[in-house]
């Protein structure tokens, strides 16, 4: 696994604390991407997961998982998708159970310890890709 290099990030002076860094893009950031291909993925227990594909024919895939009470259409998800596309990845952004537009079929909602849905997504998306990167936001 490659090692990450130190980051020289310095926030703008007007975003002088972490709270503002979180709130500002939520209110003012707009990310424009072409329309996605939306699919429904059946789970092992008969529920359904919603996925948004951003396909450009790249050999690599980034699977992006949203944060607590987020979804695949949030600006931070779209921003990450845009960045991954620019780095040569196709993108699959998925919604945890109960976080998309579809109602759950089962009485099971998501929780951070339930990795079986992520495994379902990886198995669904993997064919045809030479490399898969998992990207996740804080729960």
PLM regions: where:
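Short beta-strand element of the alpha/beta-hydrolase
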Residues: 59-67
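Catalytic nucleophile-loop/oxyanion-hole region of alpha/beta-hydrolase
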Residues: 83, 97-133
């Amino acid at each position: 696994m490659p090692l990450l290099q130190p980051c020289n990030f310095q926030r703008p002076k007007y975003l002088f604390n972490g709270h503002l860094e979180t709130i500002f893009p939520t209110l003012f950031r707009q990310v424009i991407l072409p329309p996605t291909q939306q699919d429904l993925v059946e789970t092992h227990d008969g529920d359904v997961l919603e996925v948004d594909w951003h396909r450009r024919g790249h050999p690599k895939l980034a699977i992006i998982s949203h944060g607590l009470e987020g979804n695949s259409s949030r600006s931070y998800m779209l921003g990450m998708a845009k960045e991954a596309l620019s780095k040569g990845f196709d993108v699959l952004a998925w919604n945890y159970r109960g976080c998309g537009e579809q109602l759950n079929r089962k009485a099971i909602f998501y929780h951070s310890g339930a990795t079986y849905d992520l495994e379902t997504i990886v198995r669904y998306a993997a064919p045809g890709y030479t490399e898969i990167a998992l990207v996740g936001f804080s729960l």
